[in-house]
């Protein structure tokens, strides 16, 4: 089985129902004591209005020669951090790359973003997230990137970077979230008329099931979602532990398979972290799957000392920054802007990586994996499903 690092190297050659505001204040870098030796934490100012926190490896001293080293960017998803790449940064640096993993807009120690539910959601749209990445590259003194790698929601940022600016992003690795392509513009409506609306409302259909359900992405777009997780009864550390366990290969019920259609009867086959019980929040959903104390003590890929880093960051900020990304998707705002690129494809060398136990591959029935390989990406070097990994592939099986 091809390992995660080998694949990358080969490719590159306070109240429920009310928003809790996050105050954006400058914060110190991550202490060296929580980072593997050789990974450094620092800030880059004036990145599209952000003071961006990055983790960095393979760039020991500043000089004009440093920018000649090939740059690799690692983009995390939700609920993750730059820290999520800690296990692969040093191998990439040893292979000769300047490796940068930022806390993206809405996350971690990066500041300058609006954490209010009623605030500036537009700044979290995909085109502005790509602008964030472009601005970071420019601030670092680079004009191109040898490889941009994204996981989960970061997979889509990486995909759009490479589609919009292939002159800058020379290769791309998409992880856990397949890229189905640019949203289409309505076609031939002059002759055929507008497309017919869906015969039914998927959210009403899910709620009408014998076991009433709801889709997690639309739940994440609601006002109560942030405080449900941030102010949960079990505390942020326990919530994150249960959430990460539930979506990992350690949860043995993660046995994903393709779904036939975008219907309630098919969607309800997915685990509750994707198709939730209607009257529960995410905190209650994952609490049922909290691993035992002995299982936590035996966990090698995410020991409690590392989970504490996530708990500190999300305990300070909450989750609204990352949830704004979901709102831009479910509202249609992203799709409306990205239709500008209708028909365009990713043409740079590409690959896809996911865990074999990751439902993220199949969460959108209709074949996002197939669309990615057949239509959206023209230079796909390979799709790798990694044994022993669920959703957190670069952490579970680096």
Identify the function of each model-found stretch.
Residues 79-87, 99:
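Serine-hydrolase catalytic-loop signature spanning alpha/beta hydrolases and amidase-signature enzymes
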Residues 25-41, 52, 60-63, 69-71, ...:
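Flexible "cap/lid" subdomain of the alpha/beta-hydrolase fold that forms the substrate-access gate
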Residues 91-114:
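Conserved alpha/beta-hydrolase
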Residues 389-398:
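Catalytic histidine-centered segment of alpha/beta-hydrolase-like enzymes
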Residues 2-43:
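An N-terminal hydrophobic leader/cap segment in hydrolases
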Residues 382-389:
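Short glycine-rich catalytic loops that host catalytic nucleophiles or stabilize transition states
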Residues 68, 74-77, 101:
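Structural cue for short, hydrophobic secondary-structure segments
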């Amino acid at each position: 089985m091809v390992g995660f690092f080998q694949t990358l190297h080969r490719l590159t050659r306070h109240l429920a129902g009310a928003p809790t505001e996050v105050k954006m204040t400058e914060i110190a870098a991550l202490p060296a004591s929580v980072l593997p030796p050789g990974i450094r934490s620092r800030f880059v100012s004036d990145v599209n209005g952000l003071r961006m926190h990055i983790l960095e490896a393979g760039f020991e001293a500043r000089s004009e020669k440093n920018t000649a080293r090939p740059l690799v960017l690692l983009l995390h998803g939700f609920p993750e951090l730059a820290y999520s790449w800690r296990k692969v940064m040093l191998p990439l640096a040893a292979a000769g790359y300047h490796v940068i993993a930022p806390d993206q807009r809405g996350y971690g120690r990066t500041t300058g973003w609006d954490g209010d539910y009623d605030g500036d959601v537009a700044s979290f749209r995909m085109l502005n997230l790509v602008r964030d990445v472009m601005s970071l590259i420019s601030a670092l003194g680079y004009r191109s990137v040898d490889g941009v790698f994204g996981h989960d929601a970061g997979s889509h940022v990486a995909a759009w970077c490479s589609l919009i600016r292939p002159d800058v992003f020379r290769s791309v690795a998409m992880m856990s979230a397949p890229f189905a392509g640019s949203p289409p513009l309505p076609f031939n409506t002059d002759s055929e008329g507008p497309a017919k609306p869906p015969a039914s409302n998927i959210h009403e259909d899910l709620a009408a099931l014998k076991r009433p359900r709801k889709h997690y992405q639309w739940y994440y777009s609601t006002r109560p979602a942030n405080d449900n997780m941030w102010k949960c009864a079990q505390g942020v550390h326990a919530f994150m532990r249960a959430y990460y366990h539930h979506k990992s290969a350690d949860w043995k019920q993660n046995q994903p398979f393709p779904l036939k259609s975008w219907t309630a009867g098919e969607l309800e086959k997915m685990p509750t972290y994707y198709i939730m019980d209607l009257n529960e929040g995410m905190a209650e959903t994952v609490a049922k799957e909290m691993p035992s104390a002995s299982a936590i003590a035996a966990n090698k890929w995410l020991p409690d000392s590392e989970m504490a880093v996530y708990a500190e960051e999300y305990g300070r900020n909450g989750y609204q920054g990352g949830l704004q990304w979901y709102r831009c998707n479910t509202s249609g705002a992203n799709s409306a802007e990205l239709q500008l690129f209708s028909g365009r494809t990713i043409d740079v060398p590409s690959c896809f990586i996911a865990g074999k136990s990751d439902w993220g591959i199949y969460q959108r029935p209709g074949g996002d994996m197939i669309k990615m390989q057949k239509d959206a990406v023209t230079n796909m070097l390979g799709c790798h499903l990694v044994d022993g990994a669920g959703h957190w592939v670069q952490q579970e099986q680096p």
